[in-house]
């Protein structure tokens, strides 16, 4: 264990858990240039996670009126803070949904009519109505 404390490659990661030292300080990987850029933030994250109990990770708070974006490039401020869905009159009506709903309504009405006519006939003959 002392060889890791004296090794210069692991020197910045003395406070990180032993299991994370290899992942944080691997210089033989093809991503070593990217790793060197992210070492300070990764080390701060590792220290932050180990200083709290498991499951007590601090949630990232967003300012009021902002929402997280699932994009790889930054967006301008007006685009990033626009509402999640526009007003309904701005949308074009979806004909497939309209046809589906009307088809179900007319199908239920037709089915009720087909079933009710024989039932009405049977009960009218049965009760001499």
Swiss-Prot record:
It is found in: Mitochondrion inner membrane. The chain crosses the membrane at residues 105-127. One of its GO terms (molecular function) is electron transfer activity. Residues 25-35 have a biased composition (Low complexity). One of its GO terms (biological process) is tricarboxylic acid cycle. GO terms for cellular component: mitochondrial inner membrane; respiratory chain complex II (succinate dehydrogenase). It comes from the Eukaryota. It is a single-pass membrane protein. Residues 25-80 are annotated as: Disordered. Keywords: Electron transport, Heme, Iron, Membrane, Metal-binding, Mitochondrion, Mitochondrion inner membrane, Transit peptide, Transmembrane, Transmembrane helix, Transport, Tricarboxylic acid cycle. Heme binds at residue 87. The keyword Transmembrane helix applies. InterPro entries: SQR/QFR_C/D, Succ_DH_cytb556. Pathway: Carbohydrate metabolism; tricarboxylic acid cycle. The keyword Transport applies. Its cofactor is heme. Residues 1-58 form a transit peptide. Component of complex II composed of eight subunits in plants: four classical SDH subunits SDH1, SDH2, SDH3 and SDH4 (a flavoprotein (FP), an iron-sulfur protein (IP), and a cytochrome b composed of a large and a small subunit.), as well as four subunits unknown in mitochondria from bacteria and heterotrophic eukaryotes. Membrane-anchoring subunit of succinate dehydrogenase (SDH). This is Succinate dehydrogenase subunit 3-1, mitochondrial. It comes from Oryza sativa subsp. japonica (Rice).
């Amino acid at each position: 264990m002392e060889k890791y404390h004296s090794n210069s490659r692991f020197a910045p990661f003395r406070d990180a858990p032993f299991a994370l030292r290899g992942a944080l300080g691997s210089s033989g990987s093809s991503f070593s240039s990217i790793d060197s850029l992210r070492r300070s933030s990764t080390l701060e994250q590792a220290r932050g996670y180990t200083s709290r109990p498991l499951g007590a990770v601090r949630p990232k708070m967003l300012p009021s009126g902002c929402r997280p974006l699932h994009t790889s490039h930054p967006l301008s401020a007006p685009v990033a803070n626009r509402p999640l869905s526009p007003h309904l009159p701005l949308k074009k009506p979806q004909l497939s949904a309209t046809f589906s709903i009307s088809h179900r309504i007319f199908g239920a009405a037709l089915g009720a009519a087909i079933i009710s006519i024989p039932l009405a006939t049977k009960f009218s003959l049965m009760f001499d109505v």
